[in-house]
C-alpha cells in the first residue's frame, strides 16, 4: 500500500480514490459469494469471505491514515471535514459487505424456490445503486480536479436521482422478501430464518449507504 504522503504528493484526492478502489473490491464479491451459496460451493464462499475481510481491513487503514494525516490547511475545493465525511460513508459500504460475508459463514443457509429469484433481483438492485454511485464518484473526482460547472456537474446531479430510484426499488423488493418470509406457507428452521433476516437487512445497507453517499456528493455540488 502506498503511503499517504506519496498519495498526497500525486493529488490531494488520490487517497480518496485509493480508498474507493478498496471499497469496490469488497462489494465485487457480493454476487459471487451468494452464487457460491446457491450452488453449494461452501468452501469457495469461506475463501471469498476471508478476502472481503482482508480488503475491508485495507480500506480501514486508508481511512485511518486520512483521518490522522489529511492536512487541515490544504487548499482544496472541498473542506477537510467534507472529505472525511465522504470517506466515512464510503467505508461504511465496505463494512456492510464484510458484515454480509461474515453472516454467510455463521451457518449454512439454503435458498428456497419461493424466494431465490426475488433475492437475486434484490441483490442486483443494491449492486446497481452502488455501481451508479461509483460512476457518480468518478464524475465527482473529475469535477474536483477541474471545476464544478458545466455538463459534468449536470450529469452528476442526474446520477444522484438514479441512485435514489435504485435504492427505492431495492426497498420495494426487500418488503416483498419480508412478505414471503413472514407468510404462513414459508416454513424453515428458526435459526435459518433469523440469519436470513440479518443477511437481507445488511444487504439492503449497500443501497442505503450508496444513496447517502450520493446525497452527500450532491450537497457538495450544490454548495459550489
Swiss-Prot record:
It holds the Pfam family PhoU_div. This is UPF0111 protein CPn_0681/CP_0066/CPj0681/CpB0708. Signal peptide: none annotated. InterPro entries: DUF47, PhoU-like_sf, Put_Phosphate_transp_reg. Gene3D superfamilies: Phosphate transport system protein phou homolog 2, domain 2. Coiled coil: none annotated. NCBIfam families: TIGR00153 family protein. It comes from the Bacteria.
Amino acid at each position: 500500500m502506498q503511503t499517504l504522503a506519496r498519495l498526497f504528493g500525486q493529488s490531494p484526492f488520490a487517497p480518496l480514490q485509493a480508498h474507493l478502489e478498496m471499497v469496490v473490491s469488497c462489494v465485487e464479491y457480493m454476487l459471487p459469494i451468494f452464487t457460491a451459496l446457491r450452488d453449494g460451493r461452501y468452501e469457495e464462499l469461506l475463501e471469498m469471505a476471508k478476502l472481503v475481510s482482508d480488503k475491508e481491513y485495507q480500506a480501514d487503514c486508508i481511512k485511518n491514515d486520512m483521518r490522522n494525516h489529511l492536512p487541515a490547511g490544504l487548499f482544496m475545493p472541498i473542506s477537510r471535514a467534507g472529505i472525511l465525511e465522504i470517506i466515512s460513508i464510503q467505508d461504511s459500504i465496505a463494512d456492510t459487505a464484510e458484515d454480509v460475508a461474515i453472516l454467510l459463514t455463521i451457518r449454512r443457509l439454503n435458498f428456497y424456490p419461493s424466494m431465490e429469484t426475488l433475492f437475486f433481483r434484490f441483490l442486483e438492485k443494491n449492486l446497481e445503486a452502488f455501481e451508479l454511485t461509483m460512476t457518480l464518484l468518478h464524475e465527482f473526482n473529475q469535477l474536483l480536479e477541474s471545476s464544478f460547472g458545466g455538463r459534468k456537474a449536470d450529469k452528476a446531479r442526474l446520477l444522484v436521482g438514479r441512485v435514489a430510484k435504485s435504492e427505492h426499488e431495492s426497498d420495494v423488493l426487500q418488503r416483498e422478501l419480508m412478505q414471503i418470509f413472514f407468510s404462513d406457507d414459508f416454513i424453515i428452521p428458526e435459526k435459518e430464518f433469523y440469519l436470513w433476516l440479518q443477511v437481507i437487512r445488511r444487504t439492503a445497507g449497500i443501497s442505503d449507504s450508496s444513496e447517502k453517499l450520493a446525497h452527500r456528493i450532491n450537497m457538495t455540488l450544490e454548495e459550489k
